[in-house]
Amino acid sequence: MSLKKQQQQSDFSAAPARRPPTLQSYHTSPDPRGKQILRQSASFTALNNPRMDTALPQIQDAPSNSKRNSDEGFGTKPRRKNTFSSFVNSVLGSPRNIKISAPENPVHVTHVGYDNQTGQFTGLPKDWQRMLQASGISKKEQEQHPQTMVDIMRFYERNAAGAGDEEVWHKFDNAILRQGEYPDGMSPASATSPRFPQNHEGSFENPRAAPPPPKPSQSSPVPVLSSTIVPNRVAPKPPTVGLIPSRPPPQPPVVSNRAPAARPANEPVTTPPIPENEPVFVNAPPVVPSAIQSPVQYQQQQERAMAAAQQAIIDKQLDRSRSQPAAAVARPRPRTRQSTAFDVRAKLQAICTPGDPTKKYYNLNKIGQGASGGVFTAYETNTNKCVAIKQMNLDLQPKKDLIINEILVMKDSKHKNIVNFLDSYLHGLDLWVVMEYMEGGSLTDVVTFNIMSEGQIAAVCRETLSGLQHLHSKGVIHRDIKSDNILLSMDGEIKLTDFGFCAQINDSQNKRNTMVGTPYWMAPEVVTRKEYGRKVDIWSLGIMAIEMIEGEPPYLTESPLRALYLIATNGTPKIKDEQNLSPVFRDFLHLALRVDPEKRASAHDLLKHPFMSICEPLNSLAPLVKSARISRAQEKAQKGGA
């Protein structure tokens, strides 16, 4: 019996261990489906992930069990995928319909260049190629001044795209206001710009652009330190027992590429005093301690060593800064927050006169139409004085922030040779700006229908220069001096207009004011997109003087693109029958039309020129004004009859 038991035990130990059969319940039966094949979802099948092949055993190779587990029901259909499987299948398994939205605010950018090897312009659209062919600029002229061609084409493109319409809003970029001009709580647009730094009358000659910021070096930047430096952490107090660190000071921390946080300008920078009895370890040699240090003492010594290393770095950088000038730190240009329509309206309400302007002015008569509103003549109720009113829809103004600055500057620019600002109102959605009305019209009609003498030309130049000198002293560049913007009274008084508010109240449509961006009065530095200052107004005055001589400015009969080319390349324009002019007049024009702005005269210089001594009285211009009005009325009648 014992032998039989031993044999059974040896057989049992030699046989491989097998899983005991699954217990069958009374309601279970063999699975009629046979072998169970694991189904894969469509998403995993589509992925064809090799990990699935290696991680999961092959179902076909596994031994099948004909018995079902007790939790399986008989004859049940395959269960549907759960919610998670359906979600994965919808994301990965099924193809997604790609929906591409339409572009928003598309901008077509044209990059024009010139290839010196081929002698051809690159990046020219077909429209520009046709324009260049029809401009009248020969191939030889293009090859002689390729860079000038690129500059003027970019200039013309910018004006043709509509960007030139906003130029009028930048006349006051440099304006200087007296202290306390702004109402409380207002933060109007800055009166200065990077192109025109803040200036005074003596320094506002030819501003230069700021030099480009230095390029960052490949190595880690060294922060520029001031004379007072705040360490990252205050050095701890020395321990009671004088101890020397058992190891040399650690290496200085590597300066990270992240720039340190800027400190507010008004925050005082102070350095905490260092106790006199605290030793400073700089390059201290290692010394074996005489006693075992506690963890607290060791931590304190490590902090002291770190503070000493930082102090050593600071001392070296201070010595270096004293011997070498510190490199300029490039600061990002601050961006002025764009005011909302609500903010602009709130600021305008603070500076505009309250009340209903329709009760103060009556008999409004429309005499002109601008891009954002109309120009009317009206009469003041109390004085019966005729005024000009510009009604502007604020929603159509491209530069709402600058309107506030211009109103404040115009209030401070009272001058006898400037069409003065009288009042402003907010009426509904419109801004009403009330200005002086010059019933004589513009100088354009005078030069078109009359021949002026040198004395009369000198009188116009003197009055214009007087107004320009006042504007320049305020930091204002007019940038659009021409006969259209010189208005006269019936008595011959002369005043400058068009400062953003005053539209062309002359309703005549001619080549001067209908063509977009025709720069016949512009200085060469404007056409070639260079930095410029107040001397651009002096050049325009010289061109206007030629206009009074010949009846039109130079190059008026040329195409706009060729006019740009001639202004940029010819320099001082030639005057027809220049020999018929007096020497003093020729010298006056020569000083005003210098190509180099540095050598061009200022308004102050030209007011002292001998040409001013031959000025005729202003009332001598009254007959010319009346004659021009009659001729203009007859011309309108003829056009109307035809």
From Swiss-Prot:
Keywords: ATP-binding, Cytoplasm, Kinase, Nucleotide-binding, Nucleus, Pheromone response, Serine/threonine-protein kinase, Transferase
Top-level lineage group: Eukaryota
PROSITE patterns in the cross-refs: CRIB, PROTEIN_KINASE_ATP, PROTEIN_KINASE_DOM, PROTEIN_KINASE_ST
Domain CRIB: residue ranges: 100-113
Task of the protein: MAP4K component of the MAPK pathway required for the mating pheromone response and the regulation of cell polarity and cell cycle.
Family classification: Belongs to the protein kinase superfamily. STE Ser/Thr protein kinase family. STE20 subfamily.
Name recorded for this polypeptide: Serine/threonine-protein kinase pakA
Gene: pakA
